[in-house]
Amino acid sequence: MGGAGLTSRARLVKGVTAVVAAVLASMGLASATGADPVIGGKTVLKPDRDTFEGLADMSIGVEATGAATFRRSGAKFPIKGGDVKGGPKGSIEHRGGLAFFTEGGPGVKFSKFTIRIGKRKVKLFAKSGRSEVRFLDLDLGDATIGGSEGVKLRIKGADAGLAKQGAEVLSDVFDFPFRKGIPVGVVNVKAQLG
């Protein structure tokens, strides 16, 4: 009899748990993080003219790779996923990347960009070779952040500088002392949430 009572109680707890989960899901509170999935959009990097002219003077070219494209407005990277919550905080994943190269000489590719928005810092990570490296640091100090909660996120005018790991990779490949903080350009993000 005690076993039957325990089974009934277990079923009751299981049933109540399922009802609570359904209610939370209908309220959009099922996720512990309260984050909205990122379902599309684009990020554009408008190159820093002085830095890219300096690269050209060193005979280092830069081109978009994969799904990324280079236009007059800058390099465009399609957004493929991620999660973002209020603040904003979260991550935004991209397709495509950038290749740095010399004609007939060494080169390196940074791809699969992920922007990670933290409480105090915003970092752009990329795959280089078989490793993930912190490629750029983004400064939101002078940026404009807007959008509609749960619908879209807009970040306009984030200054992008070369991160320490990104500088180390470029230094190793091109045998030149690239330094952390070199201006790379201005980043604009238009992310669709769903």
What are these model-predicted stretches?
Residues 18, 24, 28, 57, ...:
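Generic alpha-helix signal with a bias toward terminal, lower-confidence helices
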Residues 46-48, 116, 139:
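Poly-acidic low-complexity segments
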Residues 32-89, 159-194:
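N-terminal segment immediately downstream of the Sec signal-peptide cleavage site
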Residues 4, 119, 193-194:
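Solvent-exposed, well-ordered amphipathic alpha-helical segments
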Residues 65-134:
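Predominantly extracellular/secreted and cell-surface proteins with exposed
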Residues 2-33:
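Secretory targeting and sorting signals
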Residues 132-165:
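Extended amphipathic ligand-handling, pore-lining, and cofactor/metal-binding catalytic surfaces
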